[in-house]
Amino acid sequence: PLNFSQFQLLKNTFQNNGGTSLKIFELPDGRIPSGECSKFIVELVNELKQYNAKAEIAVLAFNRDTIRFLQKEIFSKSSNTEDVLVETIDRIQGLTTAFCIFFIPTESIPFALQINRFNVATSRARLCTLLIADKDILHFTTISEEVSNYFKKILQIG
């Protein structure tokens, strides 16, 4: 098990035994996270680096607008960005990292839930994956059964 006892944000966000967690925000329409969500991602990267300065962290999203915004936020506000990758899903196939933060903007929900891309995004981390999305993701009607079951499993564990 992972010992997050000294790291309140990690303890409240990830499971002690690793795996996938879900964090819901009220997100604006479009591709950019809310101020609250953006601040959370930066704080999470900072705390992961305090937990393990050498941790490899991937922050993933679908489109370049989101990535550019997150890169600017993370690289200007995080104290340690060594081994922090902020990139699109399509550019990271084959990548493995310790922690993965997968941001799904409201506009990208249909795209994010396509099974092949969802699988790529949720299978990058050796330790923990965090999905960050709007509350509407849980009620998306065209979600595949496999992805729907994945969300149900995450919600039961969390």
What does each of the following model-derived ranges do?
Residues 50-52, 92-95, 123:
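Conserved catalytic network of the ASCE P-loop NTPase/AAA+ motor domain
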Residues 2-75, 85:
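Conserved helicase/translocase motor-coupling segment
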Residues 80-92:
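A short, well-structured beta->alpha microelement
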Residues 10-12, 17-24, 74-77, 111-158:
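Helicase C-terminal subdomain and adjacent C-terminal extension
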Residues 68-71, 95-98, 112:
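Extended hydrophobic-aromatic, low-complexity segments
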Residues 46, 87-89, 116-118:
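A generic local structural motif
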Residues 64-66, 92, 106-108, 135-139:
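Conserved nucleotide-binding/hydrolysis micro-motifs of P-loop NTPases
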Residues 87, 95-107, 120, 127-132:
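A short beta-strand element within the Helicase C-terminal
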